[in-house]
């Protein structure tokens, strides 16, 4: 079967939810037995989001193959079974970087390098290579139609229809249809102007998904169809819903998947959305609720922890519990004290970089340990738990990390090339090592310790989880910490690196170096988050032992 492409653009305003809409459509097509993937084209100049501020851009989603990508790829993986790779996300910066590299190498044989054809050809090549082997590829173009940054991408997808055939390309445009209370009606003019802008670039949309806070009346949909030159059945009303997992069913109920399959001449069975119906049922029928505190340093933008928040909700689904998440700034804990943590059923400390707010996280880990509150530490959340235990239980009062204190005498956490023992002797490791002084990123296998809590939770001896960090537990100081009662519950398969720690005499205290949130989905959940939320429910009822 030849690959079919659906190009998803947005108009009128930003943040309309193109990623959720594209992922929901992909979920329906996957439920019809099609092999589907999704790509995200980002118009910013950064080569990737890896060094961008989480407060500006939101979280960096890590793929199995180690790509640092846009958070929308997290939505994609939560909605479809296909795993994303580095081919599923690229930026203007990545494209220009590659074109300039080819120019320096002489690949263009002395030609004048221009946006058309060189930049647009590079974009098209990446779209085609990323879609190889799939029946349908959804391509989300970041930004809003009319933005100057998006023009090369829009020109490239316009050319795709010419090169792969109009019968294998489809343009889906997401717009806003606002409701004006003073007039008592929805207004279609912004959508008409957005489509006009798209037409000026040479793209006639085939489908319009119209976002609104209410169902768009049939007469208004007919008006949009007439003025935008789109069949009325291809004007889809997408009203606000209380759960994003209702969107696949909402789109299917309006025949969107049937329209697309007929457009591409695809003969496939009806979509079976029973899994999504089960998710919706679990979400709508909880048996109780818990409050989990998340103590981080980027809490002013919840999207900085998007996958963690979603994973906690998935854990709630699997336990039939509503999870209320209380976001707490670690600097506030540092300055105002652990009083802020009272009344919580569980505590999670997520990942982060740098020293700001770290002492507040260490105080949080201590509070959870001393008060027998369920604790889940992720990445930096594991490192602060280790530092706290080292200082207050193992007697290593000066324990710290070289990330926060480059000259600290007892670095229980450090770059592999910085490990020191108790006598201050530096153990020099090779700078050529894959881990020495570099970011450890992507899926890594981990062997779980026999009789550990995590081995029971996972039900497996070996797991693969995704990492994104530079600092590791210092093995040279580990024995003293283990002798004080800390358990290493998971190690890298070569037995060199600590991946998971537990406190056996605590009811539920687990911390991991990897990021389990990246592999949690609403249909399957994740063993750590499911177990964590279950522990929160038991703690609330006084049943956690």
Curated annotation (Swiss-Prot):
Question: What are the GO MF terms of this UniProt record?
Answer: ATP binding; CTP synthase activity; glutaminase activity; identical protein binding; metal ion binding
Which Gene3D superfamilies does the annotation name? 3.40.50.880, P-loop containing nucleotide triphosphate hydrolases
Q: Please give the InterPro entries that the UniProt record associates with this protein.
A: Class_I_gatase-like, CTP_synthase, CTP_synthase_N, GATASE, GATase1_CTP_Synthase, P-loop_NTPase
Which positions are annotated as binding L-glutamine? 352, 380-383, 403, 470
Catalytic activity from the UniProt record: UTP + L-glutamine + ATP + H2O = CTP + L-glutamate + ADP + phosphate + 2 H(+); L-glutamine + H2O = L-glutamate + NH4(+); UTP + NH4(+) + ATP = CTP + ADP + phosphate + 2 H(+)
Stretches for region Amidoligase domain:
1-266
EC nos: 6.3.4.2
Q: Which UniProt keywords apply?
A: ATP-binding, Glutamine amidotransferase, Ligase, Magnesium, Metal-binding, Nucleotide-binding, Pyrimidine biosynthesis
Residues annotated as coiled-coil are none
According to the UniProt record, what class of enzyme is this?
ligase
Question: Under the cellular component aspect of Gene Ontology, which terms does the record hold?
Answer: cytosol
Q: What residue stretches are annotated with the Glutamine amidotransferase type-1 domain?
A: 291-542
Which residues of the sequence carry a binding annotation for CTP?
Answer: 14, 147-149, 187-192, 223
Q: What's an example Gene Ontology biological process for this entry?
A: pyrimidine nucleobase biosynthetic process
Cite the active-site annotation.
Answer: 379 (nucleophile), 515, 517
Checking HAMAP family in the record gives:
PyrG
Q: What does this protein do?
A: Catalyzes the ATP-dependent amination of UTP to CTP with either L-glutamine or ammonia as the source of nitrogen. Regulates intracellular CTP levels through interactions with the four ribonucleotide triphosphates.
| Other comment | CTPSs have evolved a hybrid strategy for distinguishing between UTP and CTP. The overlapping regions of the product feedback inhibitory and substrate sites recognize a common feature in both compounds, the triphosphate moiety. To differentiate isosteric substrate and product pyrimidine rings, an additional pocket far from the expected kinase/ligase catalytic site, specifically recognizes the cytosine and ribose portions of the product inhibitor.
Q: By what name is this protein known?
A: CTP synthase
Record organism = Photorhabdus laumondii subsp. laumondii (strain DSM 15139 / CIP 105565 / TT01) (Photorhabdus luminescens subsp. laumondii)
Q: What is the lineage of its organism?
A: Bacteria, Pseudomonadati, Pseudomonadota, Gammaproteobacteria, Enterobacterales
